[in-house]
Amino acid sequence: MESGEYANEILVSDAGSNEKLDAQSQPEEAELKKRKRVLFLCTGNSARSQMAEAVVNNDLWDQWIAVSAGTKPTGYVHPYALAALEEAGIFHQGESKSVEVFKGQNFDLIVTVCDQARETCPLWLGPEKRIHIGFEDPAAVQGTEEEKMAAFRNTLKLIRATIPPVLKEFEGE
């Protein structure tokens, strides 16, 4: 089954979330196929791009399919990113992956979320619209465990406040 298809009223999303939908709230299959695709790109694909992917797949699942990647992936999703998402009620089973995984795929929008990824965004990604929405790296914060976790919570809050309104601007295009 492909991501975004229904099986027994369970929505399978790219973020790995399963959301039980009642029959009245289920959009038509044709509507789901009209969803736009967005790629969130950062360097390590361990925090910011992962959180952006999860937020979009949770909050805008009926309009967008989000994926994320890194130009130099770390190979893991930061535990504080997963903890912040869980606290916010967002289920995410992402994995840190290279942008190379998406070679040959088409996206309606590519969003770089860190300055380094913006500078090194591969040209082979194609002529899709590209925008940059930079967020400070929460993994760079030094301090106590609570201070570090607070940085991830704050970044998630900023992502959730910033990304959905920007994507809504691109829905009609």
Predicted regions and their residues:
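Short glycine-rich anion-binding loops that position phosphate/pyrophosphate groups of nucleotides
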Residues: 46, 115-118, 137
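Conserved small-residue
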Residues: 45, 85, 110-111, 159
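Residues at the C-termini of beta-strands that transition into short coil/loop
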Residues: 70, 114, 134-136
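Short glycine-/acidic-enriched loop or helix-start segments at secondary-structure transitions
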Residues: 50-52, 78, 104, 120-123, ...
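Conserved active-site segments centered on acidic
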Residues: 8, 14, 18-101
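Mid-chain, well-packed structural core segment of small domains
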Residues: 105, 109-125
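Hydrophobic/aromatic beta-strand patches that form the interior of the parallel beta-sheet core
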Residues: 67, 109-111, 129-133
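Phosphate-binding/catalytic loops
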Residues: 4, 10, 14, 20-22, ...
